[in-house]
Amino acid sequence: VSICCLRKHEEFGGTLITELIYVHSKVMIVDDLYAIIGSANINDRSLLGKRDSEIAILAEDCEFIDSRMDGKEYQSGAFSSSLRRRLMKEHLGFLESEQAAQDSLVDDPISESFFKDVWSSIAETNTSIYEKVFHCLPSDSVQSFDDLPQYKNLQGLATTDLQEARKELKNIQGHLVNMP
């Protein structure tokens, strides 16, 4: 299991800044066969039907393509699998790289090699770089409220060495980071 979030950075007026990306849309892709896309939150306000106006669709594929799941041949839905691949490529930073190489990296989303060598590796590398450059909160380095004041007194490269910070940020791939 991997709990991740998305983060990005920019330079604004000569200052490097970063923030977690807040995604308000809700998407669940099941087995590359079904996609639920909507706006409802899992709370009474959204689900009781008396307050918020919410909408969602269930897209059940009826066209199938040859695919792989956990190293085995699999018939996945054309729409659901293409949506999953597109989102994964965006989050992993593969949209700008060569098409043939990137497609194969996200073909089998439940294989051990994808999880360790691609997903976890990119999330860990990005998390480490952001930690070094921005000294982000929340952080796994802060284990208790007692740790917080000391952590907040430390500065990242964005404050202490702008050139080195820019150099480090060039190694960020996509937006995927580990959730602390």
Would you name each region that the model predicts?
Residues 1-180:
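Long, C-terminal catalytic modules of enzymes
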